[in-house]
Amino acid sequence: MFMSNKDKYDKIFMEVFEIAHNQLNKDLKYQSIEAWDSVGHMTLMAALEEEFDIQLEMDDIIDFGTYYTGIETLKKYSIDI
């Protein structure tokens, strides 16, 4: 089954943080949920790099602090969400 980049992005967030789709919103940010701690953050980064076949720069990893910021960050790597 075809999955859009948005579907893939959402699926990664839901799987890494074990959250429901309705929790993917403007309020979802680093440390706003228990699972998005430093370890969860690096797990998320690794999953995104693997899924989209990219290597995130350190500054992008540090600045990737919200669900929506991540969408903008991936645009730098030609990944349209």
Listing of model-derived features with the role each one plays in the protein:
Residues 2-36, 40-46, 50-81:
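Phosphopantetheine-dependent thiolation modules in NRPS/PKS and related acyl-activating systems
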